[in-house]
Every structure is written in C-alpha cells, then in structure tokens.
C-alpha cells in the first residue's frame, strides 16, 4: 500500500510538472506570435510612443535615449542636467527598425544630444542564421552609421554606446546560442570606435559592465541580454560626466 501511494504521488508530481511545462510553452509561443504580429502591423514601431507625440514643448531640444530594449530600460541619470531627457527605446528592435523610425523621432523631438544604443537584436540572430553572419554584422554596422549620420545632419550630437556584452547564458538557452554572438559584438564595437569625430563621441559601456571579465557582472544583469538597475546606475556614474562635458 505504501509503495502504491508513493508511486501515485510520483506520477502526480510528474503530471503536474508536465502540465506546468506545457502551459509555459503555450504562453511563450503565444507571446512570440503576438510579437511577430505586432512587428508586421508596425514594422518601425512608430506606435510605441504614439500617445506622447506632439506633447513636447516646441522650444525644447531634449537629450534622447534612442535604441532597443536596452535603451528603453535605461533610466535617466540622477543629478542636475540642462536638458529634458526623453526615452525612445523600443523593445526587440533591430538596427534596421531603428533606422526606419529615426526620421519621425528626429523631426518630432529635434534633440540636442542622442544617446544611441543598439545592435544586439541583429547579432543575436546569428546562431539561427550562421550562413548570414557576415551580412548581419555588415548591415548592423551600416545601419548604425546611417543613424549617426542622420542625427548629425539634424544638428544633434551623438553619444554612441558600445553594444553591451552578453551576460551568463543559461543551460537551457545554450542550444540556441553561439560564441559567434560574442565575437560579433566585439567586431561591431571595434568598428564603432572608428566613428568618433566632431559631434560624435564613444561611450564604452563594457569596461564598466564586465569589470575586465568576458561577460556582464551578475549583479548588473537581469538576464543574459538585459541589465539590472544596478547595471544602469554603474553606467550612469560614468555617463553623466560625459554628457555634462559636451558643448551646448
């Protein structure tokens, strides 16, 4: 009788685990499907800030954080600033999508400074399309260059942020991952370092985030792609003096 009870309990646990696993997979699949449909409906992500468009005073030229979810999560630095800070980060966007919406955001906001952060959503596709690695990296570089040039033509100074390194990749993600992503991040960052000129400065995030290691410090990450509040605080301690040093 005791054995039967234990066996029944074990089967029950396995059944509950299987149901929970199925529910998780169904939820994940549905969220992915919704994201895919949203991109098809609005490839540039112009709807992300539709409710805020036209609300900024016309006599202001703000400082704009522009990019993907890493920019979206970047809270404004603490401390006095002479600029209003506006965030125009959109989650999941590639540099191609960022480029698509750039003109609309620049025309609306007329920024004095653009803090540009993007590229990881291009590069994280490499494990799924290894045969396109060279083109993915080249397109990422070209799109970031075009964004920088468009910002400069609009009169904005540009702070180019290096692509954040990757955090710890969990065991269950490793089948969908590749060291090629790390190498591509390094390649794009080496290229970004060549783009500095009058009106374009580099903010190298990785010495702060990795502290000399190969991946982002655990305290600075919420997952392998995204930073914690502590990570952004660490970046802001270095970014704020840089922003204050820029000519007006």
Q: What are these model-predicted stretches?
A:
Residues 98, 201, 219-248:
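Histidine-centered active-site loop/cap adjacent to the catalytic His
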Residues 66, 71-84, 97-141, 165-168:
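Oxyanion-hole/transition-state-stabilizing segment in secreted/luminal serine hydrolases
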Residues 60-62, 83-84, 109-113, 153-159, ...:
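Loop/turn elements at helix/coil->beta-strand transitions in domains of secreted/extracellular proteins
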Residues 115-119, 145, 152, 159-161:
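Conserved, well-ordered alpha-helix/loop/beta-strand core segments that scaffold catalytic motifs
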Residues 131-139, 176-187, 223-227:
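Alpha-helix N-cap and loop-to-helix initiation/capping positions
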Residues 40-96, 224, 231-233, 241:
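Mobile, glycine- and charge-enriched loop segments
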Residues 1-66, 76, 108-109, 194, ...:
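N-terminal secretory targeting modules
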Residues 168-205:
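Substrate-gating cap/lid alpha-helix
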